[in-house]
Regions:
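Hydrophobic core segments within long, regular secondary-structure runs in both alpha-
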Residues: 8, 12-23, 62, 76-94, ...
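Extended ligand-binding clefts on enzyme/binding-domain cores
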Residues: 185-196, 200, 204-330
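Extended ligand-binding groove/face enriched in aromatic
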Residues: 73-219, 224-225, 265
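Solvent-exposed beta-strand/loop surfaces of large extracellular or lumenal domains
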Residues: 471-489
Length: 503
């Protein structure tokens, strides 16, 4: 695999530090079945009432892994382990807890705090469920306990498709296209697999031209943009044509009716959600409603950029001069992410400076883990915000677009690094250059205390392993190696090394 245009071929210390943190978090045992309890480090706190559920931490932790895998495509084992852990948790009862427990209308809807007024049409205040209350069981759908098979609950199955697509693109492993159990709660146990979910969503979307709903009864451009991205991954990797339902919905409904991008002027307000039962499109200022832009960017980049620009202009951030006021952790992270995706250098510079000054980037010297504190003074780093900020940290020009529009190429059969003693050792570089038939590898120690220890790793997928040479780039000397089946084992010390593997 030769390097894609605009792609960086290495990871910095922050990215590797966050990878160490997420690896520990994902591999710490816990139980997401009904009788169990997710570990306290999984975020079920951020941005109530819509996103304060554990599964959004799983989802938001996925994106940076996909972006990192395109930086080091010849080293995938750690990414695959993390993604498997995230996806398995998403099959548990706790991932669907809102849909499984919020039955009927919210009994507290007459007592909502005034903060929720932005989220509810004024004429329905006091007699309408707030966004985030799923209302499973209300008519005309009735009780539907399957979180994927239900007519609603798009925000569960749509973002899950993104996770499954990123797993396949990162690993090439078909394990999640074999049937697996979901929820696992007695009679409420449901069997699905990647393609079945994509087929089901495609069929549902064909029947609902306004868009599938999340909570009963709300249709969200934000969640539909995410679901469209999940279908786009399935098409890219499995050769289906499911994404056409998104394209039709975008052309016929979303672009003009929901997001008001049909004018030369940028929109000042957009539809947060549409309720087809009461026939209300709830409008909010565009700075609060530009959230679909991050998911639209790989699908409809022109529309996504106009939506983003409208929101940034409303916040006074589009063409920053000097210090800026941050719009909150999640919004700041997605803004930085898109600034890097589209090479908006002034915005990137201003946001980076403010984020580093205000959001407490922190490196734990003993573990090599990197996280952001966000001035929250909490025991565990806030998961959803950290996952999104990690993606922004790793993003580069066009990197998010490439994930959904350019396949993984031949990386799964190209020379690949395995058996790295992670997290003690990490790779900041692992790239196979097809034209030169050369594999570049860079090792990084967890911290100074481990430097000098012995370590080994393997380079696999080598035809005729005895015909390959491994060189330490710094010294120009041959590295110490031994032959294994279809590969070589490299024996070295833990430190910052550069190796070149060439025929």
């Amino acid at each position: 695999m030769t390097r894609a245009t605009g792609a960086s071929s290495s990871l910095d210390d922050r990215a590797l530090g966050w990878l160490r943190y997420l690896y520990r978090k994902a591999t710490t045992p816990d139980d997401w079945d009904r009788a169990g309890q997710p570990h306290a480090h999984w975020d079920a706190t951020s941005d109530p009432p819509m996103l304060c559920w554990h599964r959004f931490d799983l989802i938001d932790s996925t994106y940076a892994i996909g972006l990192m895998a395109d930086r080091t495509p010849a080293w995938r084992e750690v990414y695959g382990r993390i993604l498997d852990e995230l996806i398995f948790r998403h099959t548990g009862w706790w991932a669907a807890r809102d849909w499984l427990t919020q039955i009927g209308h919210d009994p507290e809807r007459a007592n909502y705090p005034d903060l929720y007024r932005l989220l509810i049409p004024a004429h329905l205040w006091g007699d309408y469920d707030v966004p985030g209350w799923t209302a499973n069981g209300v008519e005309p759908w009735g009780l539907q306990m399957d979180p994927i098979g239900a007519d609603g609950n798009l925000f569960f199955k749509g973002f899950f498709l993104v996770m499954l697509g990123l797993h396949l693109r990162t690993t090439g492993d078909e394990r999640w296209n074999d049937p697996f159990d979901l929820v696992r709660d007695g009679e409420n146990t449901f069997t699905w697999f990647h393609s079945a979910i994509a087929d089901h969503l495609h069929e549902q979307w064909q029947r609902t031209p306004d868009g599938c709903h999340c909570e009963n009864t709300k249709v969200w451009p934000y969640c539909l943009a995410g679901a469209g991205l999940g279908l786009q991954y399935h098409d890219l990797l499995r050769g289906t044509d499911h994404h056409q339902v998104f394209t039709r919905w975008w052309d016929d409904v979303c672009r003009d009716r929901y997001l008001h991008l049909d004018s030369d002027e940028l929109p000042q307000a957009v539809t947060l959600y549409y309720d087809p039962i009461v026939e209300v499109a709830h409008e909010v200022p565009v700075f609060a409603g530009m959230v679909p832009a991050i998911y639209l960017a790989p699908q409809e980049p022109e529309g996504a950029r106009r939506l983003f620009e409208a929101g940034m202009r409303q916040l006074g951030l589009w063409e920053p001069e000097g210090p800026v006021s941050l719009p909150g952790p999640r919004a700041s992270a997605t803004a930085l992410w898109l600034a890097r995706e589209w090479e908006l250098d002034a915005l990137d510079t201003a946001l980076t400076r403010a984020i580093d000054e205000q959001y407490e980037p922190s490196l734990d010297a003993s573990t090599g883990e990197f996280t952001w504190g966000f001035e929250l003074d909490e025991e565990h780093p806030r998961g959803q915000y950290n996952g999104t900020m990690a993606a922004a940290q790793i993003a580069s020009e066009g990197s998010w677009w490439r994930l959904a529009n350019v396949g993984p190429g031949s990386r799964f059969s190209d020379p690949t690094v395995e058996g790295v003693d992670f997290p003690t050792v990490a790779l900041d570089q692992a790239w196979w250059d097809t034209d030169r038939e050369e594999l570049s590898i860079g090792t990084v120690p967890m911290n100074q205390s481990v430097v000098g220890r012995s370590t080994t790793f393997r380079v696999m997928n080598l035809d005729d392993p005895g015909g390959w040479t491994v060189t330490d780039v710094a010294t120009g000397e041959a590295a110490t190696t031994s032959l294994v089946d279809r590969g070589v084992e490299i024996r070295t010390t833990i430190d910052r090394h550069r190796f070149r593997v060439i025929r």
